[in-house]
Amino acid sequence: YFTSTMSFARMMMSGAALPLVFGSFILTIVGIVMMSAAASKQSVGLSLVGYVIFASTFGLTASFGLANYDLPTINAAFIATAAITFVFGALGVTFPKFFQRVYGIGFGILLATILVEIVLMFMGVSQSITDLIVIVVFAGFIGYDTYVATTVPPTLPNAVLMASNLFVDIINVFLRILNILGRRD
């Protein structure tokens, strides 16, 4: 609700949003660290607190981007993301060894792509190709994380961590598809 109010829009226009975005990013990382620690200690309370911090701050950060698109574009991105999630989730369970082998390669490609995006951002160059690369990499991560979710002991802290890992993968695919579809309008 807060992100749809006029006072929020004025704050964004005034440039006061940078500390909010930076703080939200830091808290998102804190939530991820808490969930990881909770999974290793099997602490339900720490896991849930980490999840609340992660989900609320990540959602706040994502809402900044969603405000720039119309509903048909968001709907199309949602449908495409759901299809990718279904297909790569099924592939992750069907071909786990493949996803185990390519996980490290995908992570390396992701880091290289982030560095390239930073350079391209300062050069003012279109990043459509990097959007496609990130979609492919995170689709692979969806397969890998789906596979991993089937191998960990079925406890609440593990479930929260695995769901959060998949959420990050899915939201990254969604935001990149949204970015590509939004350029067509």
Task: Name each region found by the language model.
Residues Y1-D185:
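A hydrophobic alpha-helical transmembrane-helix feature that marks the membrane cores
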